[in-house]
């Protein structure tokens, strides 16, 4: 049996856009997501540039209590996945959980 994978929805949390629309607009405009590190003092480090997310507020896009219990990278993944599910028009309660994901 040959299995197929079908991409039906997109989600993005990136240094040039925190959703698919702003990410794609950033790509088309030639935006660069790399800049000076702002999350901590880089004095004493060789690296001073990074691709940091800007203006990302997890509690605006997912349950605030859940967001508080997650590391930032997990928040990024969950928010992107939620956007992809929404973008696909999936209603998970109507789907077989063993067939989608």
Q: PLM features: what roles do these ranges have?
A:
Residues 1-101:
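Conserved "HGTGT" condensation-loop signature of ketosynthase/thiolase-family condensing enzymes
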